[in-house]
């Protein structure tokens, strides 16, 4: 599917780029809940995406030094058993953070994940079908699944 990790990382970066518009909204605009976006606010969308990027970052850190990832096994099992309840708990954690901390992580976490993926041997993620599927699910596929939410939130901010 991908020739090398840089191809994946370029695609991921391009897919993430539209979401960076959220950082340009005021705190007040980020707080407005949008019924057509799961009832989420811009801040909620930021937290939801970042929560899963954070899990992906932990997996990348583990794969940098090992053939497997306990975090990935945990995440897969939790999702299979609890699905939306897991999402709700992650979102509740992000809602407790000060908005400045959400913004700081929004500006740094995606780049940190990309950075870690550059040091993970490609055989452990890019050329490993299950691990690649995991990273796609938590990045580009996840972003695509929430593009409509992003559009609703950005329209609601104007």
Task: Give residue spans per PLM region.
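Short, contiguous alpha-helical
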Residues: 31-81, 114-158
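Short amphipathic alpha-helical segments at helix-loop
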Residues: 1-4, 37, 91-98, 127-131
